[in-house]
């Protein structure tokens, strides 16, 4: 099995905290859709650990950004149809669309989503459309003053209305994103955000501590003393409140920043943490073949459009993996290679398995560590974990039926240690 990630690098405006690759140049959208579909089609013969990409069962498709909901319905349909035509997408695949509150009004008809009866006119319009069955809504906070501060385009009433519209359209798998530790945000404001979020009948919640990334507007404001970072004590209190409320509402804390009702874990994100191969399409998108090779697409939107709008021979996509700077395509100079490849060492693969495993409630699969990296590496991991086990920062889950010298199946973080997880991960890595 494998997953597909589609990067839509367009935003109507840039948020104050965002450092993801995106642009506000809407005039490039049409050309981008053409180039994107070319990349999707050209890469169908890539070799993944599970087999040739076009023959592997695709279990998740994820539209991220940027803001995928800035595209027209017809443009999203073209991209989805291209994916389904070139890859074996499972009938029950999870297909997620990231969306901003308010975009539903102008973007999608209800028939875009599964489970909604449509009129004959709508049905004819939607022939061939591959349905989205999960929406991830970027709300961030329900406080209007904080929304203005971080330069979000919507207000709280728009966010609430969008959730209601999605539910009315038959979408029964809705995730929302929240941010805590915003400048000036109090614990009472955060408690209000959580109260509203859990009252909406959503199935999934992702909540992240605000990060001041270099080059962002918020980072500049902090350096100019216009805003101040939340202190550690407040951040810990907010995270503790998040975990408590989620538990009360019956949400499973299945990853450090992710909470879901039973049966609604994000299958796409879970595949990343489990080391499943995935194909990433679009500028700055990353891919992993399931063996040891990572691919990173050139982040330049202009060069991406130039390259994928001009090549015809699918084999060229492979031959140009390490194309030198200054190569030309369609008689135009391309300053950088369209993508780069990285072969991960055993140590890097081990470190990634540790980091991804510890982020989840299940923890590190010790049988997998022994199978992939050997008994010696497993013993080294358990030795490095020993001080944290004694201090109850790590927990060993045991099962006598499993043939491991330690009789343990998984090594996981104690919930009380999540706030120092980075330090613990560092101790366990090679």
Place the predicted regions along the sequence by residue.
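Short amphipathic alpha-helical interaction segments
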Residues: 375-388
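A short, conserved structural fragment
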Residues: 390-404
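Short active-site neighborhood of thiol/selenol oxidoreductases, capturing the structured segment around
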Residues: 5-7
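Minor-groove-contacting beta-hairpin "wing" of winged helix-turn-helix DNA-binding domains
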Residues: 404-405, 409-414
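C-terminal scaffold of the Radical SAM
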Residues: 1-3, 22-46, 56-325, 329-375
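Local cysteine-cluster metal-coordination motifs and their immediate loop/turn environment
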Residues: 9-20
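Short, amphipathic alpha-helical interaction segments positioned at domain boundaries
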Residues: 415-430
């Amino acid at each position: 099995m494998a997953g597909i990630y589609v990067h839509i690098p367009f935003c109507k405006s840039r948020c104050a905290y965002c450092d993801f690759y995106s642009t506000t140049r809407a005039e490039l959208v049409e050309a981008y859709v053409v180039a994107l579909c070319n990349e999707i089609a050209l890469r169908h013969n890539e070799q993944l650990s599970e087999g040739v990409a076009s023959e592997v069962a695709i279990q998740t498709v994820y539209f991220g950004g940027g803001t995928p909901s800035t595209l027209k319905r017809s443009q999203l349909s073209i991209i989805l149809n291209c994916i389904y035509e070139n890859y074996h997408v499972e009938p029950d695949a999870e297909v997620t669309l990231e969306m901003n509150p308010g975009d539903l009004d102008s973007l999608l008809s209800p028939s875009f989503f599964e489970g909604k009866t449509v009129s004959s006119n709508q049905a004819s319009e939607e022939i061939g459309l591959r349905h989205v069955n999960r929406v991830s809504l970027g709300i961030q906070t329900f406080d209007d003053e904080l929304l203005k501060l971080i330069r979000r385009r919507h207000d709280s009433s728009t966010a609430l209305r969008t959730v209601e519209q999605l539910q009315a359209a038959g979408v029964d798998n809705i995730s929302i994103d929240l941010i805590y530790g915003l400048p000036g945000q109090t614990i009472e404001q955060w408690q209000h955000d959580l109260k509203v979020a859990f009252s909406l009948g959503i199935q999934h919640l992702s909540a992240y501590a605000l990060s001041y990334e270099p080059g962002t507007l918020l980072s500049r404001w902090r350096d100019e003393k216009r805003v101040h970072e939340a202190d550690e004590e407040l951040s810990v209190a907010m995270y503790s409140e998040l975990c408590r409320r989620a538990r009360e509402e019956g949400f499973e804390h299945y990853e450090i920043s992710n909470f879901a009702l039973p049966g609604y874990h994000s299958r796409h994100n879970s595949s990343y943490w489990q080391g499943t191969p995935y194909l990433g399409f679009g500028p700055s998108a990353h891919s992993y073949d399931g063996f040891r090779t990572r691919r990173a697409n050139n982040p330049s939107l202009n060069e991406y459009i130039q390259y994928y709008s001009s090549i015809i021979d699918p084999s060229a996509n492979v031959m140009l993996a390490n194309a030198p700077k200054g190569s030309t395509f369609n008689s135009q100079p391309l300053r950088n290679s369209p993508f780069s490849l990285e072969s991960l060492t055993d140590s890097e693969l081990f470190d990634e398995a540790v980091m991804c495993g510890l982020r989840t409630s299940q923890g590190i699969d010790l049988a997998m560590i022994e199978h992939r990296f050997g008994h010696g590496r497993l013993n080294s991991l358990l030795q490095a974990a020993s001080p944290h086990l004694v201090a109850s920062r790590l927990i060993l889950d045991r099962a006598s039926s499993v043939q491991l010298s330690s009789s343990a199946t998984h090594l996981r973080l104690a919930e009380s240690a999540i706030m120092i997880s980075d330090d613990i991960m560092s101790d366990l890595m090679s």
